[in-house]
């Protein structure tokens, strides 16, 4: 695995094997029996899958030190965002060689919410 040390690679492979064994221990339910029996088996199977997913997350967090939540992307305030069509205007196959964009206030574009 490119850019990673060998020790963390073996640890990652070991964790993947453990998680694979967990998922293999819960095969899909059999499609036999009455509708109610099939529904109950699927419900129990989904509950076990949910537990396996939670256990897998805990294993990854404890063994690899993965942060529990992904890093949030910091976005600028909506007031500072603008649409700029000078780079990729038009449909596919056309070049965006149009006239320059005219900046309009958002209130003139969206209106005030009252009908005239």
Swiss-Prot record:
One Gene Ontology term from the biological process aspect of the record: viral process
Motif Nuclear export signal and binding to XPO1 positions after renumbering to this chain: 73-84
GO molecular function: DNA-binding transcription factor activity; RNA binding
Gene Ontology CC terms: host cell cytoplasm; host cell nucleolus
Positions of the UniProt region annotated as Disordered: 87-116
Region spans: Homomultimerization: 18-26
Keyword entries, A-Z: AIDS, Host cytoplasm, Host nucleus, Host-virus interaction, Methylation, mRNA transport, Phosphoprotein, RNA-binding, Transport
Modified residues (Phosphoserine): 5, 8, 92, 99
PTM entry text: Asymmetrically arginine dimethylated at one site by host PRMT6. Methylation impairs the RNA-binding activity and export of viral RNA from the nucleus to the cytoplasm. Phosphorylated by protein kinase CK2. Presence of, and maybe binding to the N-terminus of the regulatory beta subunit of CK2 is necessary for CK2-mediated Rev's phosphorylation.
Primary localization class, coarse: host cell
Domain remark from Swiss-Prot or TrEMBL: The RNA-binding motif binds to the RRE, a 240 bp stem-and-loop structure present in incompletely spliced viral pre-mRNAs. This region also contains the NLS which mediates nuclear localization via KPNB1 binding and, when the N-terminal sequence is present, nucleolar targeting. These overlapping functions prevent Rev bound to RRE from undesirable return to the nucleus. When Rev binds the RRE, the NLS becomes masked while the NES remains accessible. The leucine-rich NES mediates binding to human XPO1.
Subunit structure, interactors included: Homomultimer; when bound to the RRE. Multimeric assembly is essential for activity and may involve XPO1. Binds to human KPNB1, XPO1, TNPO1, RANBP5 and IPO7. Interacts with the viral Integrase. Interacts with human KHDRBS1. Interacts with human NAP1; this interaction decreases Rev multimerization and stimulates its activity. Interacts with human DEAD-box helicases DDX3 and DDX24; these interactions may serve for viral RNA export to the cytoplasm and packaging, respectively.
Family assignment from sequence similarity: Belongs to the HIV-1 REV protein family.
Name by which UniProt lists this protein: Protein Rev
Gene from which the chain derives: rev
């Amino acid at each position: 695995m490119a850019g990673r040390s060998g020790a963390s690679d073996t640890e990652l492979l070991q964790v993947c094997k453990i998680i694979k064994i967990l998922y293999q221990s819960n095969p899909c339910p059999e499609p036999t029996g009455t509708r109610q029996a099939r529904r109950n088996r699927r419900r129990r199977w989904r509950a076990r899958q949910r537990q396996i997913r939670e256990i897998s997350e805990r294993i990854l967090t404890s063994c690899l030190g993965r942060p529990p939540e992904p890093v949030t992307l910091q976005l600028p305030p909506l007031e500072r965002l603008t649409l700029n069509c000078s780079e990729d205007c038009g449909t596919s196959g056309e070049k965006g060689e149009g006239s320059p964009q005219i900046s309009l206030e958002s209130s003139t574009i969206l209106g005030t919410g009252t009908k005239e």
